[in-house]
């Protein structure tokens, strides 16, 4: 019985890794579409969001099956419960990459000089998502805590982007100002993705220690 349960937990780990990879790719593709104003790439991000949604359903079903059929002990119960929370945040990450893609499709162009720090935000959030899922699979408390610390960097970058773009808006009128507002929205979505990665890390800590740091 325990061997079967362990195999199912391993399956859960693999599914979470795959869902995390989908989220990482979605962030990279959405910001890549922004940089090149690639409409086809942006549309592919929106399509890929449905795969993330489907992964959420499949993982949720497996977690519920484990809870109902296996009667897990406290440690395993925490891991399964944390997984259910984590996939909610990953699904929202998928939604926010689709929101970024929607903005790319709706806009005519972007001010390239404003994209450097947005790209840095994207790189930081991809790493946060990757590290949060790795921390869960490896039961790595320090890695989870490093994700939480990294959120400060993303927040600082958002403040930097917003400040630069607000100044740009005050100095320009018309379409250029509208495009700057779109970039602020994209930066805000990336900041929220960082928040979701932090939530995942907090649930990892709960799964290991039994205490939620939030």
What are these regions (language model features)?
Residues 1-214:
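Cytosolic, long alpha-helical scaffolding segments
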């Amino acid at each position: 019985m325990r061997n079967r349960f362990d195999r199912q937990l391993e399956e859960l780990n693999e599914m979470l890794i795959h869902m995390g990879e989908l989220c990482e790719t979605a962030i990279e593709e959405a910001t890549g579409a922004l940089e090149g104003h690639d409409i086809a790439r942006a549309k592919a991000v929106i399509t890929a969001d449905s795969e993330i949604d489907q992964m959420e359903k499949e993982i949720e079903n497996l977690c519920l099956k484990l809870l109902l059929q296996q009667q897990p002990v406290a440690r395993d119960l925490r891991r399964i419960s944390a997984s259910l929370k984590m996939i909610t945040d990953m699904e929202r990450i998928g939604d926010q990459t689709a929101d970024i893609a929607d903005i790319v499709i709706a806009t005519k162009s972007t001010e390239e000089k404003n994209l450097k720090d947005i790209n840095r935000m994207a790189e930081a959030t991809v790493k946060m998502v990757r590290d949060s899922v790795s921390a869960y699979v490896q039961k790595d408390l320090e890695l989870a805590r490093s994700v939480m610390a990294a959120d400060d960097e993303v927040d600082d970058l958002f403040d930097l982007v917003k400040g630069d773009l607000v100044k740009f808006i005050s100095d320009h009128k018309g379409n250029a100002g509208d495009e700057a507002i779109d970039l602020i929205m994209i930066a805000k979505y990336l900041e929220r993705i960082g928040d979701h990665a932090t939530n995942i890390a907090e649930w990892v800590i709960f799964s290991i220690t039994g205490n939620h740091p939030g």
